[in-house]
């Protein structure tokens, strides 16, 4: 179920503060965050945000197409290792 339109988009305050500080100084350092639930805003475009996937921080370069989506959509939390081998096929 989608978020109510009257509430507006959500982003953690600490993340927005870091982005605003970088925009004021003009630097392009990587922002490390655990906030996968935050919505990407237009002021985040052209920044690199390292999003936590449960094990490590994965860098995500934010483009204009990503605005309105969540940060967690661009970093997978599960890795597919493949299905188990069939014993009958491996014996032959």
UniProtKB/Swiss-Prot annotation:
GO biological process, any = ribosomal small subunit assembly
What keywords appear on the UniProt entry?
A: Ribonucleoprotein, Ribosomal protein, RNA-binding, rRNA-binding
Question: Which PROSITE patterns does the annotation name?
Answer: RIBOSOMAL_S19 (PS00323)
Q: Which GO terms describe its cellular component?
A: cytoplasm; small ribosomal subunit
Entry superkingdom: Bacteria
Does the keyword rRNA-binding feature in the UniProt annotation? yes
Molecular-function GO term, any one: rRNA binding
Q: Which NCBIfam families match?
A: rpsS_bact
Which function does this protein serve? Protein S19 forms a complex with S13 that binds strongly to the 16S ribosomal RNA.
Q: Which HAMAP family match?
A: Ribosomal_uS19
Q: Which PANTHER family match?
A: RIBOSOMAL PROTEIN S19P FAMILY MEMBER, SMALL RIBOSOMAL SUBUNIT PROTEIN US19M
Q: According to its UniProt record, which protein family does this protein belong to? A: Belongs to the universal ribosomal protein uS19 family.
**What is the protein name stated in its UniProt record?**
Small ribosomal subunit protein uS19
Gene of this entry: rpsS
């Amino acid at each position: 179920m989608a978020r109510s339109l009257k509430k507006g988009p959500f982003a953690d305050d600490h993340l927005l503060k870091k982005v605003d500080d970088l925009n004021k100084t003009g630097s392009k350092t990587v922002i490390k965050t655990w906030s996968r639930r935050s919505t990407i805003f237009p002021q985040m475009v052209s920044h690199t945000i390292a999003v936590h996937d449960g094990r490590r921080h994965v860098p995500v370069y934010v483009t204009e197409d990503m605005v309105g989506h969540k940060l967690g959509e661009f970093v997978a939390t599960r890795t597919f290792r493949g299905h188990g081998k069939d014993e009958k096929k491996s014996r032959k």
